[in-house]
């Protein structure tokens, strides 16, 4: 986590790069991290909420409910068929101790920490030569947000309102800043000038 008002912030992955990464990790038999990235990109959950998930919540489920650790709010998440299939494949390869087990357990038998996940993601960035400056747990949530926004560009304001509610932001302006849209809009101002 960065200090408030500091310039370091997580970046998002281009959606196609994120999907390719999920597939490559699974192909390389790194099912836990493949699952982590898939859940982050497809649900927009914070890492603290992903780490608290148990197999019984997500395996063979169309949707599941979480109580967000940061806000205490109840949130229902729908899982699309492709993600459901990926969850099932990861479950079969990970072979956890049971359906009640947390989905992301380290080799030591403990739930991964946020700090450890961030270290792993930096290693993944290097190994797979990802074109992203600051890759961290939060990048997954931002990747989700950017994809939702991009897929609804014909009705961008509605997409931003939906994302504002999903992210529990107090305003659309905060959501725009969170997704890096405000900075992009400012930089595009320079592009409209001609010589």
Describe the predicted segments one by one.
Residues 2, 13-43, 154-155:
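Basic, Lys/Arg- and aromatic-enriched nucleic-acid-binding interface segment
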Residues 1-19, 72-81, 100:
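DNA breakage-rejoining catalytic core of tyrosine-based enzymes
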Residues 49-50, 145, 153-169:
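Active-site-proximal segment of tyrosine recombinases
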Residues 52-83:
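Conserved tyrosine-mediated DNA breakage-rejoining catalytic core shared by Y-recombinases
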Residues 82-132:
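Active-site/catalytic core of tyrosine-dependent DNA strand-transfer enzymes
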Residues 132-151:
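Short basic/aromatic active-site micro-motif
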Residues 34-46, 63-64, 146-151:
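Short pre-functional
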Residues 68-72, 167-192:
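Catalytic-site neighborhood detector that most strongly recognizes the C-terminal catalytic loop/helix
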């Amino acid at each position: 986590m960065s200090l408030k008002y500091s310039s370091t912030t997580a970046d998002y992955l281009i959606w196609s790069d994120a999907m390719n990464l999920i597939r490559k990790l699974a192909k390389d038999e790194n099912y836990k991290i493949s699952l982590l990235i898939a859940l982050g990109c497809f649900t927009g959950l914070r890492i603290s909420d992903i780490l608290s998930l148990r197999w019984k919540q997500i395996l063979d489920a169309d949707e599941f409910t979480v109580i967000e650790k940061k806000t205490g709010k109840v949130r229902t998440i729908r899982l699309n068929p492709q993600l459901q299939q990926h969850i099932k494949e990861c479950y079969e390869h990970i072979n956890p101790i049971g359906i009640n087990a947390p989905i992301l357990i380290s080799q030591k038998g403990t739930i991964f920490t946020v700090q450890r996940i961030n270290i792993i993601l930096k290693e993944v960035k290097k190994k797979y030569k990802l074109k992203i400056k600051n890759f961290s747990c939060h990048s997954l949530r931002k990747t989700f947000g950017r994809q939702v926004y991009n897929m609804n560009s014909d009705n961008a304001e509605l997409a931003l309102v939906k994302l504002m509610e999903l992210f529990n932001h107090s305003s659309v302006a905060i959501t725009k800043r969170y997704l890096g849209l405000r900075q992009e809009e400012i930089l595009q101002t320079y592009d409209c000038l001609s010589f």
